[in-house]
């Protein structure tokens, strides 16, 4: 493994459960792969722009003259996409907000899920171009969404798995940090997740 890309999403800093467990995972990864380059991108500290008309044109135009004129606009997306494509492992550490992902993570996704770079259409089917990579999702939530009555409300893991599969990343493992807002569960939530990290196949 040559490069690991870790995406931190939570703005809670040291109080963030997803960041805490991501720290544990990062430590294990660097121990297993000491020569690997670890890129840790903090979307809370350095939020990315959401797509606007100019950015959409810059990323989708097929006109060479327009592409040249808008290349500076596309530069950040190019850098983020290169960062993903050059990585062997993608780690996304994020909280669940309102049953889905924070908008800063969606902004990153919108900048790296690009036709001709991370996916393409061939014979009426989608071909993911970010192949031969693995992903680990570290997902924190106030409630319990892997079982029980709230399970249908979990839109975060299905969405992330679907979008990763779309671009060719099909080997996806998940670590859940659940019950952060439930007094009887919060004490064990992070330790339980750290134990799950130790059991991941890396």
From Swiss-Prot:
Binds 1 FMN per subunit. Keywords: Flavoprotein, FMN, NAD, Oxidoreductase. GO terms for molecular function: electron transfer activity; FMN binding; oxidoreductase activity, acting on NAD(P)H as acceptor; oxidoreductase activity, acting on NAD(P)H, quinone or similar compound as acceptor. Its cofactor is FMN. It is an enzyme of class 1 (oxidoreductase). Transmembrane segments: none annotated. It catalyses: 2 a quinone + NADH + H(+) = 2 a 1,4-benzosemiquinone + NAD(+); N,N-dimethyl-1,4-phenylenediamine + anthranilate + 2 NAD(+) = 2-(4-dimethylaminophenyl)diazenylbenzoate + 2 NADH + 2 H(+). It comes from the Bacteria. The keyword Oxidoreductase applies. Pfam families: Flavodoxin_2. The keyword Disulfide bond does not apply. Its EC number is 1.6.5.-, 1.7.1.17. FMN binds at residues 10, 16-18, 96-99. Homodimer. Quinone reductase that provides resistance to thiol-specific stress caused by electrophilic quinones. Belongs to the azoreductase type 1 family. This is FMN-dependent NADH:quinone oxidoreductase. It comes from Beijerinckia indica subsp. indica (strain ATCC 9039 / DSM 1715 / NCIMB 8712). The lineage of its organism: Bacteria, Pseudomonadati, Pseudomonadota, Alphaproteobacteria, Hyphomicrobiales.
